UniProtKB/Swiss-Prot annotation:
Region forming the signal peptide: 1-27
Nucleus recorded as keyword: no
InterPro entries xref list: APT_dom, APT_N_sf, CTDL_fold, Enterotoxin, ToxinB_BORPE, ToxinB_su2/3_C_BORPE
Protein keywords: Disulfide bond, Host cell membrane, Host membrane, Membrane, Secreted, Signal, Toxin, Virulence, Whooping cough
Protein name as it appears in the record: Pertussis toxin subunit 2
Gene: ptxB
Role description: PTX oligomer B binds to receptors on the eukaryotic cell surface and facilitates the translocation of the toxic subunit across the cell membrane.
Keyword Chloroplast: no
Biological source species: Bordetella pertussis (strain Tohama I / ATCC BAA-589 / NCTC 13251)
Family membership noted in the UniProt record: Belongs to the pertussis toxin S2/S3 subunits family.
SUPFAM superfamilies assigned: Bacterial enterotoxins, C-type lectin-like
């Protein structure tokens, strides 16, 4: 069926908007941990500089949460463009468009959306442990926090962080920091202990949860440990 001139003009007028909006509908990275809405700092840091104890929100994290997208559409006004860790967010009158970019590529924009990297979960102070794991991806994060990703058979199992300044377990930092460096360099299997009272978001696009590190035990092949 032929298309008349009026219909064709209408289709051509809305096509750019449809293509622009297609960025919003792209599939998110499967299985990543999405920071909750209350972790977002609305105005972020100036020119890519997220404040201490925060980091830039990523494209995948924003795409993976309809709640985060709805929140940002609600709090942004006008023809506003914000930096993400690896892209940009077009808020306000743009309608909430998420665009891909390179890490740090949009930090010349005035405002970056950042997330607070520490959350009190409300869970009880219960010991959780994970056996036969090795420490990888050592990260010196904000506020002198030291983190590691613990893997088993090459797959991430849990992340854990220790800090000298914040959280309930700051007094254990010196000992745990030395242990982390030791097992990371040696590549030895351990049993790692965490408390899920405090959850962290130091790693971008993490496929594992990260909590407060409370202990490390070296696996002994001659015993039942690990």
């Amino acid at each position: 069926m032929p298309i008349d001139r009026k219909t064709l003009c209408h289709l051509l007028s809305v096509l750019p908007l449809a293509l622009l909006g297609s960025h919003v509908a792209r599939a998110s990275t499967p299985g990543i941990v999405i920071p909750p809405q209350e972790q977002i700092t609305q105005h972020g840091g100036p020119y890519g500089r997220c404040a201490n104890k925060t980091r830039a929100l990523t494209v995948a994290e924003l795409r993976g949460s309809g709640d985060l997208q709805e929140y940002l559409r609600h709090v942004t006004r006008g023809w506003s463009i914000f930096a993400l860790y690896d892209g940009t967010y077009l808020g306000g009158e743009y309608g909430g468009v998420i665009k891909d970019g390179t890490p740090g590529g949009a930090f010349d924009l005035k405002t970056t959306f950042c997330i607070m990297t520490t959350r009190n979960t409300g869970q009880p102070a219960t010991d959780h442990y994970y056996s036969n794991v090795t420490a990888t991806r050592l990260l010196s994060s904000t506020n002198s926090r030291l983190c590691a990703v613990f893997v088993r058979s090459g797959q991430p199992v849990i992340g854990a962080c220790t800090s000298p300044y914040d959280g309930k377990y700051w007094s254990m930092y010196s000992r745990l920091r030395k242990m982390l460096y030791l097992i990371y360099v040696a590549g030895i299997s351990v049993r790692v202990h965490v408390s899920k009272e405090e959850q962290y978001y130091d790693y971008e696009d993490a496929t594992f949860e990260t909590y407060a590190l409370t202990g490390i035990s070296i696996c002994n092949p001659g015993s039942s440990l690990c």
